[in-house]
Curated annotation (Swiss-Prot):
UniProt similarity note: Belongs to the HscB family.
SMART domains: DnaJ
Subunit structure as annotated in this protein's UniProt entry: Interacts with HscA and stimulates its ATPase activity. Interacts with IscU.
Keyword flag Chaperone: yes
Xref: Gene3D superfamilies: DnaJ domain (1.10.287.110), HscB, C-terminal domain (1.20.1280.20)
Chain ranges of the J domain: 2-74
Protein role: Co-chaperone involved in the maturation of iron-sulfur cluster-containing proteins. Seems to help targeting proteins to be folded toward HscA.
Alphabetized Pfam families for the sequence: HSCB_C
Name assigned to this protein: Co-chaperone protein HscB
Length: 174
């Protein structure tokens, strides 16, 4: 089942998130397993599967990155998050310095000014990647979208590593 069809949305990358949520809750009310407790086991099984499909579809379309990968899949491109970065060596070489900045932050006990600066750099890159992905989807340049998704994954990963390392640092000083 196509998730765009399931939630009665046009099949395009940019979606109306409010409409997605409204349609999700309508479907949940219609197919919630608790509403079918007195039905046959086979009917309960069908309803449970439909409810799982609704939840999975909602999570997929609500999340920017998951929606991008799903939309690519619908258009004939198989994308695996695990291998995307390996195919973009030039990008990795260019932005590996962000990991060096992270190491410097750790060595300097997470200097607040440096921390804020690095967070801003990463956040700006994430926003830029998302805007580029939206633009490239509009132009149906799917191979470019895949490349930019790999970059977005890199920035999201370093953002998570920064957050994790900073939390470790905070737990050690408290």
């Amino acid at each position: 089942m196509n998730y765009f069809t399931l939630f009665d949305l046009p099949r395009k990358f940019n979606i109306d998130k409010k409409l997605l949520s409204q349609n999700f809750y309508k479907l949940q009310l219609k197919f919630h397993p608790d509403l079918f407790i007195n039905d046959s086991e086979s009917k309960k099984k069908i309803i449970l599967e439909k409810s799982i499909q609704i939840n999975k579809g909602y999570k997929t379309l609500k999340n920017f990155l998951n929606r991008a990968i799903y939309f690519l899949c619908l258009n004939g491109y198989e994308v695996k998050k695990e291998t995307l970065l390996l195919k973009n060596n030039d990008f990795l070489i260019r932005y590996f310095s962000l990991y060096e900045q992270l190491d410097n932050l750790k060595e300097n006990n997470f200097n607040k000014k440096e921390l804020n600066n690095l967070e801003q750099i990463i956040q700006k890159k994430i926003i830029y990647c998302k805007k580029k992905i939206e633009l490239e989807f509009e132009k149906t340049r799917y191979k470019k979208v895949i490349k930019i998704i790999s970059e977005l994954l890199f920035f999201e990963k370093i953002k998570d590593v920064l957050k994790k390392e900073y939390n470790i640092y905070l737990s050690q000083i408290n």
